[in-house]
Amino acid sequence: SYFETTLLTLNTRSTLRGAVKRTTYYNKAGDPIWHVEVTANFTFDGSSAKCTSATASAKSYVSNWKILDTASSRSGNSGTATALAGSYVNGVFVGSMTESVTIYCDKNGKVS
């Protein structure tokens, strides 16, 4: 798996909108299975940063994995997305996986 961070919009010197961080899961062949993604807005002023909103999304790329639930939260200078994915064999549920991804913004607007 890998983490990918993308900054979509930088509105002003103190507001960062649409910062995205995604974790994608691959099978042994290197094909993507599903991902969970957090999109967050931040404010920062050189002394501190605050996450003002966080949204979760998830997507499955294969028919035998389904996204069962997503949730988001924010705290301080971070936003988190959590997804629950279910695995199926011949349409029968065989197990699930929960994964989270968290995005941070520092006091200068640097996202990680």
PLM segments and residue spans:
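Short helix-loop boundary/capping segments
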Residues: 19-71
